[in-house]
Amino acid sequence: MSLLLLGAASQVNAAEDHSVISAELLPTSLQTSWQVNKPQLGKFGHCAAAFDSRTDDSKMAFACSIYVKLEAVAQRKAIQHCDEQRAARNIKAPCQLIK
């Protein structure tokens, strides 16, 4: 039983390691994307974003993980999808979870 609890605790800690950004601090186009996706997030969904420019959409990445049953999974998938976009667009800034 204690092994199971340790595993769950490590998953929670891993989920908390992602940096977070307030939606108000995002560039306008990312704020719009956030507002469009926010109602669909449900209890566990998360979105992540990265940007090197506040005006050039080609220097922005945005991804959400919506249909999941665990918050840690949603966080991890949102960051993963954002990182894929970030790499494809050569964005230097790290992906951050949006709160």
Question: What feature does the model see in each segment?
Answer:
Residues M1-L3:
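Sec-dependent signal peptide recognition
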Residues V12-K99:
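Secreted/extracellular ectodomain signature
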Residues G7-A9:
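N-terminal signal peptide c-region/cleavage motif recognized by signal peptidases
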